[in-house]
Amino acid sequence: RLYLSDQVTTIDMSRYIGELIGDLGSSMGPDWAAAIETDLDPVCIEPGRAITIGLILTELIINAQKYAYGGKPGPLRIAFQEDGAFFRMTVEDEGAGGHLAGKGFGSMMIKSLVGQLDGTIDYRDRAPGLSVVLRSRIDPLV
């Protein structure tokens, strides 16, 4: 859904994430799509960083689908907010909990992508559920 041209300098993350979630919801089915709630600030990010954030979000949503509710639909909240010079993306479920960062390919990929953003990611078991918070600068340090 992210179409780039030489003129694109920033991506509105509220629109990009909304479209990404819509596409993922379509592939996961209507019950999953209906269970996703969003709170998305219109934060503008340069395209390369937006793509990286989208990959992280996609992996977190897939993990919630697989582990939080045993493959069945359940509430999933996604927020993207501006926090001064930083953004904060939160993905929360109300599922089984306890599925913190693993050692599989998806977890390694997320760790690598977070490193590309020079950001941090925090997994918190909410018992029930899991909260994952990604935080990084809106603009990269040059």
Language model regions located:
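Glycine-rich/acidic phosphate-handling loop/turn and adjacent ATP-lid/helix
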Residues: 82, 86-108
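Conserved short strand/loop->alpha-helix "switch" segment adjacent to the catalytic nucleotide/phosphoryl-transfer site
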Residues: 11, 29-61, 66-72
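ATP phosphate-binding glycine-rich loop and adjacent ATP-lid/helix-beta elements
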Residues: 99-125
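The cytosolic transmitter module of two-component sensor histidine kinases
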Residues: 6-17, 49, 53, 57, ...
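Short beta-to-alpha transition helix within the HATPase_c
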Residues: 1, 10-27
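A conserved short beta-strand within the histidine kinase catalytic ATPase domain
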Residues: 73-81
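Glycine-rich nucleotide-binding loop
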Residues: 75, 86, 97, 126-133
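C-terminal end segment of the histidine kinase catalytic
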Residues: 134-142
